[in-house]
Amino acid sequence: CEDVLIRDCTVNAGHTLLGIGSELSAGVRNVRMENCRVDCEVWRLLYVKTNPRRGGFVENVTMDGVTAKKVTQDVIAVSSRVYYGMPGQEVAGPNPQLTRIEGVTMRNVHCDWALRGVTLRCDPDYPARDFRLENVVIDEVFENFVRVENVDGVKLDVTARKIHPDAHW
């Protein structure tokens, strides 16, 4: 899947505004979402999720000019080890097929309320690369504001106007 443009949308129902994965085995590239508004409660605004048994790539994903009211999980989340409850599935085997994740940009995003801000948790054996978050504003954050693991080349311009006392950095 490549060269996807999503723009000028108003979302009134759904669980993730832009979700990529989890069972991809080929690739996703050049995805752009711009000037969208989320009027409902969603789990996440941008979620990239991959399974270490599938391989493939995710590259050049941009979200620009998005407003949201309530995000019940993460404003942006990336996980390169997503499993769906099959016993033994969490073991990728001797030759895991890790997914290359690079070139993810989120800019000019405003969210009124989020449980968590930024959660980027990637594989230590194949770190994600080149993440840019520019002018991302969250009015209230209740748990982790920023958590980044195994990502090379991260640039964060993320503001939380109010972080609740039990939130972690």
Show where each model-derived region lies:
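Extracellular/periplasmic carbohydrate-active domains that bind, remodel
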Residues: 1-169
